[in-house]
C-alpha cells in the first residue's frame, strides 16, 4: 500500500500538471481571441473601413476633370464613371443584406473590403497601361502664362495642335474608359455589405442605450471620409501625372498651367492599401461575440407573437424554429421569399415613411452638396481649389460633428421612438430655415460683354447679344474654354481674346473703348460684385450651422428604423434602406439639380462643333432654383416625419397601457415588456420607469422566423 502511494501521488501530479497545462492553454486561447471579442475593437475596424470607403468615393469626384482631360472623355462619360459605383451597389445590396444576416457578417464585410481594394487598384491601372502624357510645349496662342490672347492675322493658326486630331482622339473608343467603369462597379459591389451588416452587428452586441452612439460614430466616419478624399485629391493633383517615369525638373509647366495633369492615380493606390489592411482585421472577429451580462442589454425591438424571444437571440439576428433544421430552405426558396418580405416591410407605414424621409434628407445632400463647389464658384467668384478647400474644412467636418452629436443626444436623453422622431422633426425645421436664408445670400450676375451687356458698356437692348464684335473679329477667338478677364471698364469678358488683347501681358485691349488706350488693360478673373464678400462670409457661417444641424437627424432615423422591425429582419431592413437611399436619394437628385442648373445658363461653350459645358449662369435665377429644390425636398421630408410621428402616437395610445389589471393577448404583445422581463412579475403601479415604445411590424400570421414565410 505504501508502495502505491508514490505511484498514485506521481499519477496525481501528472494529472495536475496536465490540468494546469490545459488551463494555461485555455488562458492563452482566451488571450488570443480577447482582442477580437470586444465590440469596441470591431467599431474601430468598421470605422477604418468606412473611412476608406468615403475617402475613395470623394477622391474620384475630385479627379473627374483630370480624368476627362487625361483620356479625352466627355462630361457624359465621366458621369457614367461616377454612377457606376451605385450600379454595382444596387445589384447586390438586397441579396447581401438578406443572406448576410444568416452568415458570418464580419467575414462578409472583410470580403467586401477586399473587393473594394481591388476596385481601387483597378482604378489606377489605366495610367500604367496607356502612353505617357504629352502636352504641347510653347503654344504661341496661349503665351507664356497660358492666356488666350488675340491671334491677329492668323499668327497662331499653325502653332497649336491639329483641331481635327483632337476631335478624333476625343471621339475614339477608349478601353481605359471601360476599365474605369469596371473598377467603379467593383467598388460598389464591395461596399454592399459594409454598412448594413456592420450596423446590425454592432446593434446586436451593444446595450440599447449605447446603440445610437455607436451608429453615430460609424456614420461620422463615413461622412468624414469625403473630407479626406478632397484633401487627398488636392495633394495628388499637384504632382505631375508621370512623375514616377520622368524627371520632373525638366518640366516647363506648373500646376497652374491649363495643360497640367496631376497624378490622379496616386490616391487610388493609397485608398486601395487602406481598404485592404482595414479589411484584414474583419476576419479576426467571430460570428457571435461573447455575451455580456451588463444592465440594459435589452433591445427595444418589435415584439412578435409566441414565446420565441424567451430563447437567446443569435448574434446574427436570425431566429430559427427549434424543430427546423438549418438547411430546410433551399437557395431558390430563400430567393423567392425576398420579394414577399420586401413587400411586407414596405406595407408598414412607419417603416415606409421613415425610409422615404431619410431618402429626402439624403437627396438634399446628394444633389445640393454635389454642386455646392460649382455654386460657390459661380455665386461668389471663387476658384475651384478654394471652393473644394472650404468644403473640406467647413461643411464636411460640421456634418461629421452633427452626426456624432445626433447619436450622442439620443443616448444621453434616452429618447424613445417618439422622442427620436420629434428630434428629427425639430432638426429638419431648423435646417430648412437655414436653406431659406440662402435665398437672400448671394451675388448678382456680373455684366459680361456680349452676353448680358453690349460691348462699350451699353445696356442689353435692341439686337441680340453676340460675344463677337468688330473689335475682336480678326482675333480667331474660340469658345471651347472660359478664361474670364475683368476689364478696366468694370466689364467681364469671356477671355482676353474677346477683349481684343493682343499681348500676353493683357494690355492694349481693343474692345475697352470707354477708357483711354493706355488704360485698356484687363486682369484675370471675373469682375467683383459689390457686397459679395460680406454675403459669402454670412453664407459660409450659415452653411456650417446648416450642415451641423441637418446631419443630426441621420442617427435618430436609423435608430427608429431598426427599432420598428423584428430582430430577424433588422439586417434586411437596413439593406432595403440603403437600396432606396441609392435609388431615390443618390441617383435622381444630381440629375434633377443638374437639369435645373443648366436651365439657368446664359452662355454655352462649344467644342468640335458641339455644345459643351455652360460657362456663365444667371446668378439670381441659379440661386433661387438651386436652393428651392433643396427646400422642397426638406419640406417633403418634414411631411414624412410628421406622418411617422402620427402613426407612432396613435399606436402608442392604443398599445401602451399601464400594468394595472389584466392584458389581452394583443395588448401583451405590444406592451412595454421586453426580452429580459418576459415571464417576470408585472412592475408595480407605483414604480416609475420609462415606458418604451414597441411597434409590432409583423401581423400574427408572420410570427415565425424568415423561413416561415416560405
UniProtKB/Swiss-Prot annotation:
Annotated Gly residues bias: 1-15
UniProt catalytic activity: L-thyroxine(out) = L-thyroxine(in); prostaglandin E1(out) = prostaglandin E1(in); prostaglandin E2(out) = prostaglandin E2(in); prostaglandin F2alpha(out) = prostaglandin F2alpha(in)
Bilayer topology term: Multi-pass membrane protein
Cytoplasmic compartment spans: 1-40, 101-106, 204-222, 287-344, 411-414, 563-571, 649-705
Superkingdom field: Eukaryota
Disulphide bond pairs: 471-501, 477-497, 486-511
InterPro entries hit by this protein: Kazal_dom, Kazal_dom_sf, MFS_trans_sf, OATP
Residues recorded with modification N-acetylmethionine: 1
CDD domains, alphabetized: MFS_SLCO3_OATP3
Start and end residues of each Kazal-like domain: 465-513
Annotated glycosylation sites: 153, 169, 381, 457, 502, 505, 519
Primary location group: membrane
Residue stretches spanning the membrane: 41-60, 80-100, 107-131, 175-203, 223-243, 262-286, 345-366, 387-410, 415-438, 540-562, 572-597, 631-648
Record-level GO BP terms: monoatomic ion transport; positive regulation of canonical NF-kappaB signal transduction; positive regulation of MAPK cascade; prostaglandin transport; sodium-independent organic anion transport
Expression (tissue specificity): Expressed in many brain regions, including frontal cortex, brain stem and cerebellum. Associated with neuronal bodies in a punctated matter. Detected at the arcuate nucleus and the choroid plexus (at protein level). Little expression, if any, in oligodendrocytes. In the cardiovascular system, detected in cardiac muscle cells and endothelial cells of aorta, coronary artery and left ventricular endocardium (at protein level). In the respiratory system, detected in alveolar epithelial cells and in mucosal epithelium of the trachea (at protein level).
Extracellular compartment spans: 61-79, 132-174, 244-261, 367-386, 439-539, 598-630
Disordered: region residues: 1-25
Compartments (UniProt record): Basolateral cell membrane; Apical cell membrane; Basal cell membrane
Entry annotated with the keyword Zinc: no
MF annotations from Gene Ontology: organic anion transmembrane transporter activity; prostaglandin transmembrane transporter activity; sodium-independent organic anion transmembrane transporter activity
UniProt GO cellular component terms: apical plasma membrane; basal plasma membrane; basolateral plasma membrane; plasma membrane
Keywords: Acetylation, Cell membrane, Disulfide bond, Glycoprotein, Ion transport, Membrane, Transmembrane, Transmembrane helix, Transport
UniProt family annotation: Belongs to the organo anion transporter (TC 2.A.60) family.
Purpose of the protein: Putative organic anion antiporter with apparent broad substrate specificity. Recognizes various substrates including thyroid hormone L-thyroxine, prostanoids such as prostaglandin E1 and E2, bile acids such as taurocholate, glycolate and glycochenodeoxycholate and peptide hormones such as L-arginine vasopressin, likely operating in a tissue-specific manner. The transport mechanism, its electrogenicity and potential tissue-specific counterions remain to be elucidated.
Protein name: Solute carrier organic anion transporter family member 3A1
Gene responsible for this protein: Slco3a1
Amino acid at each position: 500500500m505504501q508502495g502505491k502511494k508514490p505511484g498514485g501521488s506521481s499519477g496525481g501530479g501528472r494529472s495536475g500538471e496536465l490540468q494546469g497545462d490545459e488551463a494555461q492553454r485555455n488562458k492563452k486561447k482566451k488571450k488570443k481571441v480577447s482582442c477580437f471579442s470586444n465590440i469596441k475593437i470591431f467599431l474601430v475596424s468598421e470605422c477604418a473601413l468606412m473611412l476608406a470607403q468615403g475617402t475613395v468615393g470623394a477622391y474620384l469626384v475630385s479627379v473627374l476633370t483630370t480624368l476627362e482631360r487625361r483620356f479625352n472623355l466627355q462630361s457624359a462619360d465621366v458621369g457614367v464613371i461616377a454612377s457606376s459605383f451605385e450600379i454595382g451597389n444596387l445589384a447586390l445590396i438586397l441579396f447581401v443584406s438578406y443572406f448576410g444576416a444568416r452568415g458570418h457578417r464580419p467575414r462578409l464585410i472583410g470580403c467586401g473590403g477586399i473587393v473594394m481594394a481591388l476596385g481601387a487598384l483597378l482604378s489606377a491601372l489605366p495610367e500604367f497601361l496607356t502612353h505617357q502624357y504629352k502636352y504641347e510645349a510653347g503654344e504661341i496662342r496661349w503665351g507664356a502664362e497660358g492666356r488666350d490672347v488675340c491671334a491677329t492675322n492668323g499668327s497662331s493658326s499653325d502653332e497649336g495642335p491639329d483641331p481635327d486630331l483632337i476631335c478624333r482622339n476625343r471621339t475614339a473608343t477608349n478601353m481605359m474608359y471601360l476599365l474605369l467603369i469596371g473598377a467603379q462597379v467593383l467598388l460598389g459591389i464591395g461596399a454592399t455589405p459594409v454598412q448594413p451588416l456592420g450596423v446590425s452587428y454592432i446593434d446586436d452586441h451593444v446595450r440599447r442605450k449605447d446603440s445610437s452612439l455607436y451608429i453615430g460614430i460609424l456614420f461620422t466616419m463615413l461622412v468624414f471620409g469625403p473630407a479626406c478624399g478632397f484633401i487627398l485629391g488636392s495633394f495628388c493633383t499637384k504632382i505631375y501625372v508621370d512623375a514616377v517615369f520622368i524627371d520632373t525638373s525638366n518640366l516647363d509647366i506648373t500646376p497652374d498651367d491649363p495643360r497640367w495633369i496631376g497624378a490622379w492615380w496616386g490616391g487610388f493606390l493609397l485608398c486601395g492599401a487602406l481598404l485592404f489592411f482595414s479589411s484584414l482585421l474583419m476576419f479576426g472577429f467571430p460570428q457571435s461575440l461573447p455575451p455580456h451580462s451588463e444592465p440594459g442589454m435589452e433591445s427595444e425591438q418589435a415584439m412578435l407573437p409566441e414565446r420565441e424571444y424567451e430563447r437567446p437571440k443569435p448574434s446574427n439576428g436570425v431566429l430559427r424554429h427549434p424543430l427546423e433544421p438549418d438547411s430546410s430552405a433551399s437557395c431558390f426558396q430563400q430567393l423567392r421569399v425576398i420579394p414577399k418580405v420586401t413587400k411586407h416591410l414596405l406595407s408598414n407605414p412607419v417603416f415606409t415613411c421613415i425610409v422615404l424621409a431619410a431618402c429626402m434628407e439624403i437627396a438634399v445632400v446628394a444633389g445640393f452638396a454635389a454642386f455646392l463647389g460649382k455654386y460657390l464658384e459661380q455665386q461668389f467668384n471663387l476658384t475651384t481649389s478654394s471652393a473644394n478647400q472650404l468644403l473640406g474644412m467647413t461643411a464636411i467636418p460640421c456634418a461629421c460633428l452633427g452626426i456624432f452629436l445626433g447619436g450622442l443626444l439620443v443616448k444621453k436623453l434616452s429618447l424613445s421612438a417618439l422622442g427620436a422622431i420629434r428630434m428629427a422633426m425639430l432638426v429638419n425645421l431648423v435646417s430648412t430655415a437655414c436653406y431659406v436664408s440662402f435665398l437672400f445670400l448671394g451675388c448678382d450676375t456680373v455684366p459680361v460683354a456680349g452676353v448680358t451687356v453690349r460691348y462699350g458698356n451699353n445696356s442689353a437692348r435692341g439686337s441680340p447679344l453676340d460675344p463677337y464684335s468688330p473689335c475682336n473679329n480678326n482675333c480667331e477667338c474660340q469658345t471651347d474654354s472660359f478664361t474670364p478677364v475683368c476689364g478696366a471698364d468694370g466689364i467681364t469678358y469671356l477671355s482676353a481674346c474677346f477683349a481684343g488683347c493682343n499681348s500676353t501681358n493683357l494690355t492694349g485691349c481693343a474692345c475697352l473703348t470707354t477708357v483711354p488706350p493706355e488704360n485698356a488693360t484687363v486682369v484675370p478673373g471675373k469682375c467683383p460684385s459689390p457686397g459679395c464678400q460680406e454675403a459669402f462670409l454670412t453664407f459660409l457661417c450659415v452653411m456650417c450651422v446648416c450642415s451641423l444641424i441637418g446631419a443630426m437627424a441621420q442617427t435618430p432615423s436609423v435608430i427608429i428604423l431598426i427599432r420598428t422591425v423584428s430582430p430577424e429582419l433588422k439586417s434586411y431592413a437596413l439593406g432595403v434602406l440603403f437600396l432606396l437611399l441609392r435609388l431615390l436619394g443618390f441617383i435622381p437628385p444630381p440629375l434633377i439639380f443638374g437639369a435645373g442648373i443648366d436651365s439657368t445658363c446664359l452662355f454655352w461653350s462649344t467644342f468640335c462643333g458641339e455644345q459643351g459645358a455652360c460657362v456663365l449662369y444667371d446668378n439670381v435665377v441659379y440661386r433661387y432654383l438651386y436652393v428651392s429644390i433643396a427646400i422642397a425636398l426638406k419640406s417633403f421630408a418634414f411631411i414624412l416625419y410628421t406622418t411617422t410621428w402620427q402613426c407612432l402616437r396613435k399606436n402608442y395610445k392604443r398599445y401602451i397601457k399601464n400594468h394595472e389589471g389584466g392584458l389581452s393577448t394583443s395588448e401583451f404583445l405590444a406592451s412595454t415588456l421586453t426580452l429580459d422581463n418576459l415571464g417576470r412579475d408585472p412592475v408595480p403601479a407605483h414604480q416609475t420607469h420609462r415606458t418604451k415604445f414597441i411597434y409590432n411590424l409583423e401581423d400574427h400570421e408572420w410570427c415565425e422566423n424568415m423561413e416561415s414565410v416560405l
